[in-house]
Amino acid sequence: MDAFSDILSGVKLIGAVFFAAEFSAPWGFTMPSSCVMTARLAPGASHVVLYHLLIEGRSVVEMLSGEQIGLEPGDIVVFPHGDAHHMSSGKGASLPFPNYGISDKVKSRDLSPLHAGGGGEIARFVCGYMTCDPHLCGPILNGLPAVFKVNIRTDRAGHWLENSILHLVEEAASGRVGSAAMLAKLSEALFIDTLRRYVSGLSAEQTGWLAGTRDPVVGKGLALLHSRAAHPWTNADLAEEVGISRSALVERFTRYLDEAPMTYLTRWRLQLAARALQKTSRGVADIAAEIGYESEAAFNRAFKREFGQPPGRYRAEHKSLLTNRRNKADD
């Protein structure tokens, strides 16, 4: 399995479409940051990635920094770090935007399209989100900008995803049994497909973890480290399996990931340990051995360096945090 798939398969992604609209120009609204949206959409989540998929018409996304991104039909715009932003018809739309009752629609989970605006050109779109653990998704999230867009209408797979999501949004709005669960799975597929399209569009000069997965040397090295994380790797062993000199391997990893292979392996092992501490009741010594540590004490020291606290406290605080979030969600 490649490293990209390995991370995504090991992280519990939960997706949903939370809003559908048919606005007429001029129109505009402000989407708060994920800190605010998490409480509204997924109170038990530790991180929310937001996205908008434009179905018809034109739109402009403006970040609080002033950066503007024009959207065409089929464009999906993603906010990996949950940055606040404005979305509007562009020309003729100005702050402060009217109150269209979006918050009420989101709160009620009503997916029937909201109709609003000034009577001009029509824009149809849906808004969705993905939840994930930022520690376990770190390699992917850290390699993404504050905002990016791709167009999913460039092939049949993208058309199928778009049409399927629109069909299920209509079904969910009418209350058909099972439509919400199917929509959640499709939202996850759309997110992964969008990431793949983003990676395939990176320039040859681009660095970072995502770009590294495309490089024949770094990509193969990452796949080996992920598939055999507990193996007692050395730079020389990994270089031999990849088919390159040790010095060239280290240089290539450092160029793309800004760290040497064994440094990356250590962090990946500790992320696997964090996942096990969160999701299982296995003992710390067993987890340490499973990821390649012969000494529990050495594992404890490494874990504290990475996460700022020993494994036992990390597990206890994670459980407490989940309990508090669930209690708030029930209030």
Segments (PLM) and residue ranges:
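Short helix-to-turn junction characteristic of helix-turn-helix DNA-binding domains
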Residues: 54, 225-228, 277
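Basic/polar phosphate-binding segments, predominantly the helix-turn-helix DNA-binding elements
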Residues: 189, 193-199, 220, 224-271, ...
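Generic protein-terminus/edge-of-domain signal
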Residues: 1-69, 75, 86-114
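Alpha-helix-centered segments that form part of catalytic cores
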Residues: 109-136
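A short, N-terminal "cap"/entry segment at the start of jelly-roll beta-barrel domains
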Residues: 1-30, 124, 138-156, 324-330
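An amphipathic alpha-helical interaction segment
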Residues: 126-223
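Residue-level recognition of short, solvent-exposed, well-ordered loop/turn junctions
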Residues: 72-73, 80
